[in-house]
């Protein structure tokens, strides 16, 4: 092999290696920023079609209804813990260390985004509450399916305390 062919081979090898490195870094970056949506039942039992459960440490979004009577606040900090359930009966505990949205109440639909820290526990970095009584996030509405009924709030729930 002459010198010219060796240079071409080295250049082609470096080019292919560089493209492979860039592609792998790009896929890694996209994968780490991917937030998959799960219902509480899917977190506990796995997806219906595939049986795939989210892994501990994975960034996910979970949507459902805040279980009435499940909210526990730490009086000395912003830390709050509450349960989110769906129509199929699955329940996930969500912990959050920031201010909750003004529209957050027990018995209403929410979407929480964060990291799964245990099989049924999510450490949320963001909590989104529905806008009004008629609105429900599309993922939650689809996950709740036909069994979602309009909720009747008592005076205490409407006041937010």
Curated annotation (Swiss-Prot):
On the Periplasmic side, which residues? 30-161
Q: List localization entries.
A: Cell inner membrane
One GO term in the molecular function aspect is: metal ion binding
Name the keywords, alphabetized.
Cell inner membrane, Cell membrane, Cytochrome c-type biogenesis, Heme, Iron, Membrane, Metal-binding, Signal-anchor, Transmembrane, Transmembrane helix
Q: Which residues lie on this side of the membrane: Cytoplasmic?
A: 1-8
Which InterPro entries does the entry mention? CcmE (IPR004329), CcmE-like_sf (IPR036127), NA-bd_OB-fold (IPR012340)
Sequence positions that bind heme: 131, 135
Task: List the transmembrane segments.
Answer: 9-29
Source species, domain of life: Bacteria
User: Topology versus the membrane, per the UniProt entry?
Assistant: Single-pass type II membrane protein
Tell me a GO biological process for this protein: cytochrome complex assembly
Coiled-coil region(s) at which residues? none
Write down any Gene Ontology CC term: plasma membrane
Quote the SUPFAM superfamilies the UniProt record gives.
Answer: Heme chaperone CcmE (SSF82093)
Q: What does this protein do?
A: Heme chaperone required for the biogenesis of c-type cytochromes. Transiently binds heme delivered by CcmC and transfers the heme to apo-cytochromes in a process facilitated by CcmF and CcmH.
**Protein name (database record):** Cytochrome c-type biogenesis protein CcmE
Organism, by scientific name, is Shewanella woodyi (strain ATCC 51908 / MS32)
**Gene it is expressed from:** ccmE
């Amino acid at each position: 092999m002459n010198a010219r062919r060796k240079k071409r081979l080295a250049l082609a090898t470096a080019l292919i290696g560089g493209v492979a490195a860039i592609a792998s870094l790009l896929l890694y970056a996209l994968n780490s920023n991917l937030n998959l949506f799960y219902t509480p039942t899917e977190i506990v039992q796995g997806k219906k079609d595939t049986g795939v459960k989210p892994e501990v440490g994975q960034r996910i979004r979970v949507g459902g209804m805040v279980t009435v009577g499940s909210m526990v606040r730490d009086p000395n900090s912003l830390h709050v813990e509450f349960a989110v359930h769906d129509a199929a009966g699955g329940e996930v505990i969500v912990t959050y260390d920031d201010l909750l949205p003004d529209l957050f109440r027990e018995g209403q639909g929410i979407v929480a985004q964060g990291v799964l820290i245990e099989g049924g526990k999510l450490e949320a970095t963001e909590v989104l509450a529905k806008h009004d009584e008629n609105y429900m996030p599309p993922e939650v509405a689809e996950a709740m399916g036909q069994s979602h009924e309009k909720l009747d709030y008592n005076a205490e729930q409407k006041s937010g305390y």
